[in-house]
Amino acid sequence: MNTKTMKIIMMLLGNLLLGIAVAILRMSRFGTDPFTCMNLGVSGFLNISFGTYQLLVNIILFIFVLWKGRGCIGAGTIVNMAGIGYIADFGVFVLTKCLGQPEMLSMQIRILLMIFAVTMCSFAAAMYMEADMGIAPYDAFGVIIEKISNRKIPFKVARVLTDVICVAIGFSFGSIVGVATVITAFCMGCLLYTS
């Protein structure tokens, strides 16, 4: 298997696992990553599916990234922006059929789901970033802010700012903010910073 094929497999598998991890986090009810938190809150308020709303937001962000951060775009960008939300929606549907409504799950099950999902999320993100075939439009924002500020706002600060804004919006629209929100924000920020 050549390097290009391996990278494509890593990118596709990484994004698939990210979508599944988001679904499991939603089932745990301990919060999700900041971007998902925002999109869940607003999509619930507007009464449209999470997958559709996330795609619409990603298209808007993609236009900005195309203008200011073209180097961040690749096949992985398109797969991530179009796929994660719908994979997560389908995952929640399947998990609800298998486990029942999230509200009915015991605390122990929810904690196990959260631990498993956070671990999977970190592993999947590392896999899709290692493939180096583009990053999600939201993930590109920290890179772009650092670039257009001439490094006056470092990536880490930019990422914290965007995450805090997303969590604030999500919370104001009724999204669950919990321990998983903090953990995933920290893990994803570190992964992006070191990649």
What are these regions (language model features)?
Residues 19-20, 62-63, 86, 90, ...:
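Alpha-helical transmembrane segments of multipass membrane proteins
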Residues 37-47, 140-147:
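Short amphipathic alpha-helical coupling elements at transmembrane boundaries
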Residues 45-56:
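Structural signature of hydrophobic alpha-helical transmembrane segments
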Residues 61-71:
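C-terminal ends of transmembrane helices
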Residues 75-83:
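Cytoplasmic-side transmembrane-helix entry/capping segments in multi-pass membrane proteins
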Residues 106, 110-111, 177-186:
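Loop-to-transmembrane alpha-helix initiation sites
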Residues 117-143, 151, 160-166:
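Alpha-helical transmembrane segments of helical membrane proteins, especially in multi-pass transport
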Residues 193-194:
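Conserved small/polar residues in nucleotide/adenosyl-binding loops
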